[in-house]
From Swiss-Prot:
Stated role: Bidirectionally degrades single-stranded DNA into large acid-insoluble oligonucleotides, which are then degraded further into small acid-soluble oligonucleotides.
Entry's localization field: Cytoplasm
InterPro entries (alphabetical): Exonuc_VII_S (IPR003761), Exonuc_VII_ssu_sf (IPR037004)
Entry EC number(s): 3.1.11.6
UniProt similarity note: Belongs to the XseB family.
Single Gene Ontology MF annotation: exodeoxyribonuclease VII activity
SUPFAM superfamilies in the record: XseB-like
Location (main, coarse): cytoplasm
NCBIfam families associated with the record: PRK00977.1-1, PRK00977.1-4, xseB
Reactions catalysed: Exonucleolytic cleavage in either 5'- to 3'- or 3'- to 5'-direction to yield nucleoside 5'-phosphates
Gene: xseB
Top EC group: hydrolase
Keywords from the named record: Cytoplasm, Exonuclease, Hydrolase, Nuclease
Protein known as: Exodeoxyribonuclease 7 small subunit
Amino acid sequence: MALKKPENMHYEEAIDELENIVNHLEVGDLALEDALKQFERGIALARSNNQKLQKAQQQVNILMQQDAQAPLQEFNDE
C-alpha cells in the first residue's frame, strides 16, 4: 500500500502514523536504512501537521478579528 502524502492526510491520521513511527524507532529493531526512512517520514508528517496548526491558528485569529465585540477571556485549565 502506498503511503499518503502528509499534506493529504487529516491531522489525526498523521498523528497516529507519527506515534507508530516513534514506537518503531524507540524499539530499535529497524535496520539503519529503514530507521532513516521512518525518521524522514516522521519529519515530513510533523512539518505538515505544524503547517496545519498554523493555518488553523490564522483562521481562529481572523474569526476573532471579525467578531471584535466578543471579549477574550483567559484560558484556565484547572
